[in-house]
Amino acid sequence: MNLYKIKHPEEQVNFAQAVRQGLGKDQGLFFPETIPALTNIDELLALPLVERSQKILGTLIGEELPKATLDAMVKNAFTFTAPLEKVEDNIYALELFHGPTLAFKDFGGRFMAQALAAVRGDGKITILTATSGDTGAAVAHAFYGLENINVVILYPKGKISPLQEKLFCTLGGNIRTVAINGDFDACQALVKQAFDDAELRQAIGLNSANSINISRLLAQVCYYFEAVAQLPKEKRDNVVVSVPSGNFGNLTAGLIAKTLGLPIKRFIASTNANDTVPRYLESGNWAPKATVATLSNAMDVSRPNNWPRVEELFKRNGWNLSDLGSGMLSDGETEETLKAMYAKGYLCEPHGAIAYQVLKDQLKADETGIFLCTAHPAKFKESVERILSLDLPLPEALDKHNKLPLLSDEMDDDFAQLRAYLLK
């Protein structure tokens, strides 16, 4: 698999190099040089998740990894299901929260851990990543206890749910967590500064586990196929997928699936009040505002890292950006949507609720809608209980960590401090 850097296409790497490096020079994103079209979509959709995913990732990555190695990586990573649940006649929820940390990022985080272990070579590696909630838990649990891999996770202090924080800030060992006095964009900016410091990168073997790492992104492609595979065959012709969007890695993965040949008619990017992309698609003016805190905190991102990959896919495929649907919901609208969904018999959380409502508003009569449920409702226990006036029991995975003490350090939004912390 050959990849190039979107900013500077002359900088090219193979899959192993892209996994090890995470980002290119000058914070450049790596992207596959070619995405081969699959010709046997119906046969693939008839296969179980793991076997189908082995074939999809084998096609994308090519012969760089031995087939037995890649097949084992997929089997070890995808140890849980992604059920498609009917919410109403033509709308389905793809539940991506049945993994060990109850969020969609278990797919990408676990596959990346397998990939890095397979290609890392000698020497220690430091994973540095920023999280607005779910990435931290998925990465921490995927890499916890792996030899010669240290993990440092930055997150905005006071801006993620207490349960999210407990899920990844209680492990210790090779997992260090840092609460930054700033928002998620500040955390991302610190990560990017670290990657631009060549001396630091070399000294600690720096890598990233955000969706900027290609291995995470490729793993996420697989659950879009799983969604369509679970639809009745008569409903596969006009499929519309609504993606709750913050950093836009999830949407990028869906667009790669469409490029491979998965029959998805169109996508909708659904955001909260941090609506840089919906405003851009409407006006043509890229104008990020200051990030605001919302109920759907994992989407509190006003400068999405993966947007260049989205535009690259549209350009390469000859698609028109105006065909990408978008919409946003305020916190008040999100609360009303959660109540309406619960009245229909479906318990959701803020991110999934936004994706559902924007889909419902834009879905046509002859279309089948799928919205992505990216986290278990219990990960947002306080909000969901308050909005729906119910008592939400904690799943075992959350309950266990909820009883443990936080092990986080605290730091100002200051790269010099972070650099010293990483080197010690």
Give the residues covered by each predicted segment.
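PLP-dependent amino-acid enzyme catalytic core
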Residues: 1-424
